[in-house]
Amino acid sequence: MKDHIEKYDFSAAISPIEEIVEEARNGRMYILVDAEDRENEGDLIIPAQFATPAQVNFMAKHGRGLICLAVTRDRAKLLELDMMARENRESMKTAFTVSIEAKEGVTTGISAHDRAHTIAVAIDPTKVADDIVSPGHVFPLVAREGGVLVRAGHTEASVDISRLAGLYPAAVICEIMNDDGSMARLPELVTFAQLHGMKIGTIADLIAWRRRHDRFLERRIESDFESAWGGKFRATVFRNTLDGAEHDAARHQETRERRDGVQPHQDRGGIHDLLEVVEHDQHAPAFERPRDALFESGFAVVADAE
């Protein structure tokens, strides 16, 4: 049996991210698996707006892990959720806040109905901090801004999927455990998914998908200037939305029609030094070769790749 499991091609059981997003959009529960060198676990996930008592009960009965609510930093801030620990020393840096309960509409708070109601209140745009209390039986997790491109965890992945599906950016997640209490790995997760008619996706595939399709740079400032080296340029400052870093680019107006391309520039002197915008440029000799290459090849753009 072990040899059969080792030879089985589990990649055939993995669904493309587009299918996982479609499952989420239609309110169906799915499974996401993280990397083997990380937690190497699979989580049951459903967009928070579809978390009915039946779905919560399924997670408690079949998932057996901790049922958590993944939310954005903005939502956690609006609900005034304090972090569970002042210093997060957990190995994966999972961002737990204090546990919560709906202020009204619950009894003991632990039933599937009560937890589903608490989740509904926590993601309701009309509700505020006064509508929840702590401690409770729902455990919020705060997703990092930038999602899986910043942290490759189930928290970020579940919020990313909800957002890609055009839904409220929150999700209910629960680790999947085996009958004996051990964590389910991919072979067991495939069996679990087949038994319950679910699709499995991977966080690695989600990261790859976002890298292919997302736009990370936003245009901040543009201005035209004359270069002492020759010609007119248009300088643009871009901001990386993932880490906030700014990058410079300059387009040579006169070579624009010759050949469209990008010449990366990594010297700390910056774009203005390269093009000798500042008089008596002390760095000019260091830029002689890349600058020559820029004009001789007809490249239209020089970018600060620092």
State each model region's role:
Residues M1-A250, R256:
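Catalytic domains of riboflavin
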Residues Q55, F225, A293-F295, V302:
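Short, intrinsically disordered/low-complexity patches at protein termini
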Residues L206, G270, E276-V277, A300-V301:
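Generic short N-terminal amphipathic or hydrophobic helices
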Residues T255-L275, F287-F295:
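Hydrophobic, low-acid, alpha-helix-prone terminal segments
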Residues V278, P290, G298-A305:
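Short, intrinsically disordered low-complexity segments enriched in Ser/Thr with adjacent Pro
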Residues E279-A284:
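N-terminal helix-forming leader/targeting segments
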